């Protein structure tokens, strides 16, 4: 069992106890113990996209295509490309590129229902939402924090347009966000 699995299980148990009314005043101390139990892991190589110029061209092409059609769509490969580029250290790619494009895609209803479900789960996968989170300060923060920001846009889009995510999907997200908040030590993660 990984450190993340252990913390996920502990947080779920605490949430269950809280929902049963068995803990309340003790919860902050219990969460503090979870935070104190986190072990720093050795740094490992971080996969960061290095194709900034190509990425910007591709992002602009998708933006242009979406704005020029009355029935916008995005391919699964394009979604994978965009998710991978949330890890970019270049703000022109990550912030003004991928992040803005995802929001445009949500607003244009360019995703299929299946793509929404798949992307929602993908952004919460351990290798995305918790990317290098146990290691010393590193650039994995960009993938973590921007995945969380895209999730917030997805939730809004789902509630106002798509309506395909289930109560179980939302509860799993609450769990993951609670764990993220406990684990994120780097201030850039709360931008």
Q: Which residues fall in each region the model found?
A:
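Short coil/turn connectors between adjacent alpha-helices in alpha-solenoid helical repeat scaffolds
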Residues: 107-114, 159-165
């Amino acid at each position: 069992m990984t450190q993340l699995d252990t913390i996920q299980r502990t947080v779920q148990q605490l949430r269950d106890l809280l929902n049963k009314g068995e803990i309340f005043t003790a919860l902050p101390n219990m969460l503090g113990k979870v935070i104190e139990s986190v072990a720093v892991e050795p740094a490992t190589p971080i996969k960061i996209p290095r194709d900034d110029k190509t990425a910007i061209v591709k992002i602009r092409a998708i933006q242009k295509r979406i704005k020029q059609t009355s029935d916008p769509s995005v391919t699964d490969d394009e979604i994978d490309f965009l998710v991978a580029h949330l890890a970019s250290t270049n703000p022109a790619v990550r912030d003004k590129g991928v992040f803005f494009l995802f929001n445009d895609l949500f607003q244009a209803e360019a995703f299929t229902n299946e793509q929404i479900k798949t992307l929602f789960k993908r952004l919460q996968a351990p290798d995305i939402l918790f990317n290098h989170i146990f290691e010393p300060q590193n650039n994995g923060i960009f993938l973590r924090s921007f995945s969380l920001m895209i999730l917030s846009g997805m939730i809004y889009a789902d509630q106002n347009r798509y309506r395909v995510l289930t109560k179980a999907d939302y509860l799993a997200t609450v769990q993951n966000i609670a764990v993220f908040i406990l684990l994120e030590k780097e201030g850039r993660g709360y931008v």
